Amino acid sequence: MINFDRKKYPIYASFLNQLAKDLTKFYNSKLNRTFKVSNKLKGKGYDPVTTSDRAFEKFIRSRIKKKFPTHQVIGEEYGSTNSKSDYTWVIDPIDGTRSYVIGNPTWSNLISLNFKGIPILGLANFPVLKKYYLNYSDKLAYVVSQGKKKKLSVNKKATFKNVKVSGAFHGWLSLNKQKKIPKIL
């Protein structure tokens, strides 16, 4: 068990709540118009990165640095900062860059706060959908959609009868293996 001071949850949760709102405003004011796409992979393969990925990450990093200047930050586009802090922010500025590029609204900004390597808070923000999810370790999770907050919980009576699975495997899971997914469930 880690010795994270749980009294600090409200500080970080408040920051992430505001950051989700700010990221949505940032997207709507600047990033939903035009962007450029390039390939991060040299040679074989294709891993797209957009100017929006980079802009989101810079925006997130600036907010973290302003509020928590001693914390370490690791981001997909700009790597890590050097810090001896027990706190590390992990950023995927656009999870689902391929969806972003084609205009599918299911991409998100993913941000995790880790304490001594253990995730303690996580944010999944969907700017186009005006929705975000926030979880506090394994204790509490909620969704904010269209400004309304709803606590999430595990359904103790869940069955797999009505489960739907969606994924984008982009070459790392063969079509043959993808066909076996329904059998697993």
What kind of region is each of these model predictions?
Residues 140-151, 172-174:
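Short helix-loop capping/hinge motifs at secondary-structure junctions, enriched
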Residues 83-142:
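DPxDG-like acidic metal-binding loop motif
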